Amino acid sequence: MVDTPFQQPQSLNVRQNRALALAGVFQATQLTHMTAMTGQQSIGETGNFYFEQLIKASLNIRPALNTSTQTLDFFNQLGDIALGLKTLESSINQPFSTTPKSKIPKLPSAKLPMSYAMALLQLEKKVYSNPEYVAVIEKSQQKILKQLSFFDNNYMHPSIIANLAQAYVDTAGQINPRILVRGNAESFKDPNHTNRIRASLFTGLQLAHLWRQLGGSSWNMIFSKRKLLQDIQTLARLQYQMV
């Protein structure tokens, strides 16, 4: 185990920390969506930046050893999750219908990150209630953290992303119903492309676990949307005050 890489001087309250962890989930699913629809190259340096911050956090979120109650202990600054905050806010303002007419709902592309996020929140409970899957995640984290020294701490190295993707396949990828990611069919033939998508989903799974550790629940999220939106807006203001 390694210490969490960053420390922040200010403290957020319980609700704000929970909202920030949830925003991390939505950042992961937004990146999943962007990569699937337009390809890993088109998300640009900004998308890569947000992805790298999620990777760093996901490698330090432990199944049962997270003593910190501050989500920012796993990030450098609020700006690292700006994409997630924006995606989460949009999702709350445009709620996703939970009663699709078919098993594979034809959702507007803007709502796909929301559907992926809700699926990850459900998968997280199943993954972390299975000791075998928990062991896979811990082993994968240890392996990747050791590998980083060989790749000059390049979190975006193809081998690092491939191992994150494999961790997802070996855990959440074994549970039905699986997340069906919609995108460019031709791009899915490229293993680097699919690795990127699965690695993004793995980081979302980890942030979902942190959210759960901080007291997050699906019911609370559904019935406290107004409070959640207030917390997101407060975090957005704090982000600009801290720059």
Swiss-Prot record:
It holds the Pfam family DUF489. The keyword DNA damage does not apply. One of its GO terms (cellular component) is cytoplasm. InterPro entries: HflD, HflD-like_sf. Its main location: cytoplasm. It is a peripheral membrane protein. It is found in: Cytoplasm; Cell inner membrane. It comes from the Bacteria. Keywords: Cell inner membrane, Cell membrane, Cytoplasm, Membrane. Signal peptide: none annotated. Belongs to the HflD family. NCBIfam families: PRK00218.1-6 (NF001250). This is High frequency lysogenization protein HflD homolog. It comes from Acinetobacter baylyi (strain ATCC 33305 / BD413 / ADP1). The lineage of its organism: Bacteria, Pseudomonadati, Pseudomonadota, Gammaproteobacteria, Moraxellales.
